[in-house]
Amino acid sequence: MHKIGIDLGGTKIEGILLDEKYNTIQRKRIETHQENGYDSIVKSITSLVNELKAKTNEGISVGICTPGVTNANSGVIKNSNTKCLLGMPLKKDIENVLGYQIVMENDANCFTLAESLLGSAKGYDVVFGVIMGTGVGGGIVINGTLHKGRTNIAGEWGHHTLYPNGNECYCGKQGCVETYISGTALEKRWLELTGKKEPLQSVVQDLSDEKAKQWKKEFLENFGISLANVIDILDPDIIVLGGGVSNIPFLYDEGKNFVYENVFSDIIDTPILKNHLGDSAGVFGACLITDEHYQ
């Protein structure tokens, strides 16, 4: 059986067709066009699936990687920073158009599964995968299988409370991790401190003045406390970082030290590594979730 994986992102939708050995047959990327609304996204996804399906005569399985979690009871999307998806039965609507069942999972779980089986965490038993981009998400893989929890929210460390009564989050809570260490939050904090609106990749090029040092110190402290809490609860064999924020080099030395300083144990050597698959993790993870589903 061949596999189609779709990665639905905030700015792009990527699709891939793989054979049984995970060799790429066809790959395509299109724009998401959130401004055109929910129905446009459903149409774009189903059209891309049909286009990829036409490239093979084999049977197919389809997996879709989405921002946000599918509510286990109602089947609607929640906790998505792609706001037009919120409250919508995305899986059901796609299946109605295609005429067959698909598998759907959130982007952090797809990322973690892909990195566990094909990437930086290959060979480790208990893996915590982190996405720090527009938002903050996490996933847990144990012995090669996703651990999703009773209500599909296992690993959602981005909505742990870092500061009670802190920054407002789109989820309705205050003080969520996401509102402090996502790329969006970091750029917002930089603007507050300096009055400059700059992309994160520019900000980290020069952190020599006092405001920049303050920004970095706050970031490292929040990163360290947030991940230390995960280690205290899960004690994973490895943590893999993904998303645009994961490209910041100092997270892997200074950042790791801040994590270690805040962990309960005095014996701590948890590897904290950068992802191997880059922005391909989503589509590969979408294909891999179909393996889990069809076992």
For the regions a language model picked out, list residue spans one by one.
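Active-site glycine-centered loops adjacent to acidic/histidine catalytic or metal-binding residues
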Residues: 107, 133, 286
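A charged helix-plus-loop insertion that forms the helical arch/lid used to bind
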Residues: 75-86
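Glycine-rich phosphate-binding loop of actin/hexokinase-like ATP-binding domains
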Residues: 122-180
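A cytosolic small-molecule/anion-sensing beta-strand core signal
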Residues: 19, 66, 142-143
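Short glycine-aspartate micro-motif
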Residues: 3-7, 61-63, 103, 127-131, ...
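ATP-binding/phosphotransfer module of carbohydrate and carboxylate kinases, centering on a glycine-rich
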Residues: 1-61, 71-74, 92-100, 116-123, ...
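A short acidic/small-residue loop/turn micro-motif
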Residues: 32-33, 85, 153-156
